[in-house]
Design a protein with these regions (language model features):
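Canonical positions in the second alpha-helix
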Residues: 71, 120-121, 171, 220
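Terminal, low-structured helical/coil segments at or just beyond the last alpha-helical repeat
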Residues: 186, 199-225
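Short coil/turn linking the two alpha-helices of tandem helical-hairpin repeats
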Residues: 19, 51, 56-58, 89-108, ...
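The tetratricopeptide repeat
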Residues: 46, 79, 129-131, 183, ...
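Short helix-capping/linker turns of helical repeat alpha-solenoids
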Residues: 21, 39-43, 74-76, 90-91, ...
């Protein structure tokens, strides 16, 4: 993968310009320069980190995503998670807003891609990916129930609610194991969405339970602190 490309150099120059108005960019600039230098010198891990950073910011996008996909096909969990988050959260480039449209999130295609990457990472043992995969089930069951007249997706069935509960509780249980790669933010979020599943008033929801909903909502709030 090419390191010091025209797009990358332009991004670095934009960051340097931003420093004149906001000194907080200094830390990120230093990190990017060090990462690129290490990658240029052949440090495998840094090449990987640079590809992930570039993809997330829409820099040399096709090449960066191709590099990550190659690693993902080799069974690299971090590459799979990075691609999952890319299609779940999208691209963000503060200096070139046109890059943000490289990935259109909240579409059926992007959600399917994100779920596919998380599922592959989960199958390889990533609890973090499993949490996000379970969260996808919870969000579908909870959100699609809120305003059915505005939804384009098929309405969730009773089994969708049960599936969301099963996958969330399984991910939560696995997060207690030693060496878990979960983040506090990820766990807090899965607690929140599980609470939303229990709170759903959809008549097809067989697990509606206000008490359980409040329990997981409170757990989510405490986990953030």
């Amino acid at each position: 993968m090419e390191i010091l490309t025209k797009e990358w150099n332009s991004y670095i120059e934009s960051m340097k310009s931003a420093l004149t108005k906001n000194k907080e960019w200094q830390e990120e600039l230093d990190s990017c320069l060090a990462m690129a230098e290490d990658a240029k010198n052949g440090a495998e891990g840094k090449i990987f980190d640079l590809a992930a950073y570039k993809a997330n910011h829409g820099i040399d996008f096709k090449e960066s995503v191709a590099f990550l996909n190659k690693k993902a096909d080799e069974g690299d969990i971090f590459a799979l998670k990075t691609l999952g988050f890319l299609y779940c959260l999208g691209v963000f480039n503060p200096f070139d807003k046109s890059k943000n449209s490289l990935v259109e999130i909240d579409t059926e295609e992007s959600e399917q891609k994100a779920a596919s990457y998380f599922k592959r990472a989960s199958d390889l043992g990533s609890v973090h990916a499993n949490v996000w995969f379970a969260m996808h089930d919870c969000i579908y069951a909870a959100v699609e129930s809120d305003k059915p007249e505005e939804n384009t997706e098929p309405a969730p069935s009773s089994e969708d609610f049960l599936k969301a509960e099963r996958s969330a509780l399984k991910a939560i249980e696995e997060s207690k194991k030693p060496g878990c790669d979960c983040t506090p933010e990820g766990m807090s979020t899965i607690y929140y969405w599980l609470s939303r599943v229990y709170a759903s008033n959809n008549p097809l929801n067989p697990i509606h339970d206000e008490e359980k909903s409040k329990y997981w909502e409170e757990k989510s709030k405490k986990f953030k602190k």
